[in-house]
C-alpha cells in the first residue's frame, strides 16, 4: 500500500510543497523569510478575526470599542498588541525578503517576482486601511491626506476621492468600507500567496551562488523545516518582546486622541514602514509629481528583471554591485528617517537627494556596474 502522504489527493499537494520538495543544499537564513511571512499572515488573520468580533466600525464607537477590547475583553490587550506589532514584523520580513530577492537575483523568476510585487502592494493597501480603524487622530488625518492624493489625477481625481470617501470628507461611510476592505484583503493575499508558491515550485528555489542547483538537492523535511522552525521561534520572540514590553514603541502618540476633524496634528505621518515612500512623495513640490514618484518607488520593482545586465545571477561574487546594493539599503534607511521628520531644512534637501539617488541607483548605476563587472571578467590577453 502506498504511503497516504503520497497517494491522497490533498495531502499529496502538501507533501510536494513542504515535505518531499527538493531544495538546494546551500540556501542560507535569508531564505527563511518566506515561511516567516506565511506565519505572520496566519498570526494577523487570527488576531484580526478575534479583534473583529469586538470592534465596531462606526465613527461614534470605533475608538471606544478599541479601548473596550484592551480593557474588558479577555486578553484583548494582548490580541491588539500582537496585531499592531505583527504588522511591523510582517513589513520587516517583507523588506528583508525583497532585499534578498534583489541581492541574489531571485527576480529572474519573473512570474514569482511579479506576483510578489502585487503581494507587496496588496499588503501595503491592507495596512493602510487597517491603520484607519482605531479612529484616532493619526488614523483620521492619515486617511484624509493619503486618499486626497488621488485628487491629483487629472479630470476624474476629485470625483474618485469623493467616491472612495462615500461623501465629501472622511466619515462614517469611509470607516465602514475601510473595515470591509481590511477584512477581505488578507484572504485575497492568501490566494496570491498560493499563486506565488505555485510559480516558485515550477522553477525551484534560487540559491546564494546563483548557479543552477539541480545537481545537489536535499528534501525540504527535515532539513529546512527545522531551520524554518528556528527562524520562527526567533521572530516570535521579537514579536512577543515588542507586544509585551513596549507595545506602543512603533505607534504614534497622536492616535491615543480620538479623531477630531477640527484639529490637525502638527506632523501627519504614516507608520514607520511607509515612511520611505512618504519621504519620496514629499520631496517633490508638485502634487501629481509626488504621487507619480510614490507609485514609481514601489512599481520600479517590476522593471528590475529588465535591468539585469550581469552574466552572473547573484551579487555573491560581484563586489561593485554589492557596494551599490548596500548604499541603496542605507539610502532607504535615510528616506525612512526623513519621512518621520518635519518639512523644514535640512530635511527637505536630504529627502530630495535621497529620492534622486534611490532611482539613480536602481535604474542607472546598478545596471552599469553589471556591465562593468562583465567587462572585468573578460580575458584581456
Curated annotation (Swiss-Prot):
Amino acids binding heme b b562: 83, 182
Keyword flag Metal-binding: yes
Parts forming coiled coils: none
Cellular location(s): Mitochondrion inner membrane
Gene Ontology process terms (BP): mitochondrial electron transport, ubiquinol to cytochrome c
Database matches in InterPro entries: Cyt_b/b6_C, Cyt_b/b6_C_sf, Cyt_b/b6_N, Cytb/b6-like_sf, Cytochrome_b, Cytochrome_b_C_euk/bac, Cytochrome_b_N_euk/bac, Di-haem_cyt_TM
Misc remark: Heme 1 (or BL or b562) is low-potential and absorbs at about 562 nm, and heme 2 (or BH or b566) is high-potential and absorbs at about 566 nm.
Self-association and partners: The cytochrome bc1 complex contains 11 subunits: 3 respiratory subunits (MT-CYB, CYC1 and UQCRFS1), 2 core proteins (UQCRC1 and UQCRC2) and 6 low-molecular weight proteins (UQCRH/QCR6, UQCRB/QCR7, UQCRQ/QCR8, UQCR10/QCR9, UQCR11/QCR10 and a cleavage product of UQCRFS1). This cytochrome bc1 complex then forms a dimer.
Name of the protein this chain belongs to: Cytochrome b
Amino acid at each position: 500500500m502506498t504511503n497516504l502522504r503520497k497517494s491522497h489527493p490533498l495531502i499529496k499537494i502538501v507533501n510536494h510543497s513542504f515535505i518531499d520538495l527538493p531544495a538546494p543544499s546551500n540556501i542560507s537564513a535569508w531564505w527563511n523569510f518566506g515561511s516567516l511571512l506565511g506565519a505572520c499572515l496566519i498570526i494577523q488573520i487570527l488576531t484580526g478575526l478575534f479583534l473583529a468580533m469586538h470592534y465596531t466600525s462606526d465613527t461614534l464607537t470605533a475608538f471606544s470599542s478599541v479601548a473596550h477590547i484592551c480593557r474588558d475583553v479577555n486578553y484583548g490587550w494582548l490580541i491588539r498588541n500582537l496585531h499592531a506589532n505583527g504588522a511591523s514584523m510582517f513589513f520587516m520580513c517583507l523588506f528583508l525578503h525583497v532585499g534578498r530577492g534583489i541581492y541574489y537575483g531571485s527576480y529572474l523568476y519573473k512570474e514569482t517576482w511579479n506576483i510578489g510585487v502585487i503581494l507587496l502592494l496588496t499588503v501595503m493597501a491592507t495596512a493602510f486601511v487597517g491603520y484607519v480603524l482605531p479612529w484616532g487622530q493619526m488614523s483620521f488625518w492619515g486617511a484624509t491626506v493619503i486618499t486626497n492624493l488621488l485628487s491629483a489625477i487629472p479630470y476624474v481625481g476629485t470625483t474618485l476621492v469623493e467616491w472612495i470617501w462615500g461623501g465629501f470628507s472622511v466619515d462614517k461611510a469611509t470607516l465602514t468600507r475601510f473595515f470591509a476592505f481590511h477584512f477581505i484583503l488578507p484572504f485575497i493575499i492568501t490566494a496570491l500567496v498560493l499563486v506565488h508558491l505555485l510559480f516558485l515550485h515550477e522553477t525551484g528555489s534560487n540559491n546564494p551562488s546563483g548557479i543552477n542547483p539541480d545537481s545537489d538537492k536535499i528534501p525540504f523535511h527535515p532539513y529546512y523545516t527545522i531551520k524554518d522552525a528556528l527562524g520562527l521561534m526567533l521572530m516570535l520572540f521579537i514579536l512577543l518582546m515588542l507586544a509585551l514590553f513596549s507595545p506602543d514603541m512603533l505607534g504614534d502618540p497622536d492616535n491615543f486622541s480620538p479623531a477630531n476633524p477640527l484639529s490637525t496634528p502638527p506632523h501627519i505621518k504614516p507608520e514607520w514602514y511607509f515612511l520611505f515612500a512618504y519621504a519620496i512623495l514629499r520631496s517633490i513640490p508638485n502634487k501629481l509629481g509626488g504621487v507619480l514618484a510614490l507609485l514609481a518607488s514601489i512599481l520600479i520593482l517590476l522593471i528590475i528583471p529588465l535591468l539585469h545586465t550581469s552574466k552572473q545571477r547573484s551579487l555573491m561574487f560581484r563586489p561593485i554591485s554589492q557596494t551599490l546594493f548596500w548604499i541603496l539599503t542605507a539610502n532607504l534607511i535615510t528616506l525612512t528617517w526623513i519621512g518621520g521628520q518635519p518639512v523644514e531644512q535640512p530635511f527637505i534637501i536630504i529627502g530630495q537627494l535621497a529620492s534622486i539617488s534611490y532611482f539613480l541607483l536602481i535604474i542607472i548605476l546598478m545596471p552599469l556596474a553589471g556591465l562593468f563587472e562583465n567587462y572585468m571578467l573578460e580575458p584581456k590577453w
